[in-house]
Amino acid sequence: MITNSLDPVISIGTLAKKVGLSVSAIRKYEEQGLLISHRTYSGHRLFSYEDIERVRSIQHLIKELGFNFEGIRRMQAILPCWDLLPCEKKVQENCLAYNGTSKPCWMIKEAHCTLKGNECRKCLVYRFGSLLTEDIKDLIHKERYETDQRSRIKQLLNET
């Protein structure tokens, strides 16, 4: 039987063993908004194979790069979800995820995409946000640089 990497098939205990953490540490990651579990009807947490890499990435940020939970959350909060999941300008202006800097979009229950019924566990922003956090600076710098360059070129063309 082949399973999708997003299918919730791993118990919290199995996940903890695979990544070398305690069950309480996995719960703490979830409590801090760094990990989203799937809940069964009986309330048991299940995780996907992708969550194994997500937890390993979080461990790397904490142990090797010296981040704390708040630092990781704030870094994930600046992920440009509006570029990955384009939404209308009017929606962006009123979106708490777009305007906020302290929580990633999947922690904001009033985010526009959540209200539309999107499941954060399966969302591109959440799925790759944890894995890309080390490259956020490059992503944002490149975007800003290209935007500044385009603006500067337009300005120069208008002056001639």
Report residues per predicted region:
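Flexible, glycine-biased helix-capping/connector loops in cytosolic signal-transduction modules
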Residues: Q32-G33, G43
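Alpha-helical residues within the helix-turn-helix
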Residues: K17, E30-E31
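Arg/Lys-rich, alpha-helical DNA-contact motif
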Residues: I2-I12, K17-K18, I36-R39, Y49-T160
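Short coil turns linking two alpha-helices in DNA-binding domains
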Residues: V19-A25
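A short, glycine- and basic residue-enriched loop/turn
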Residues: I26, H38-L46
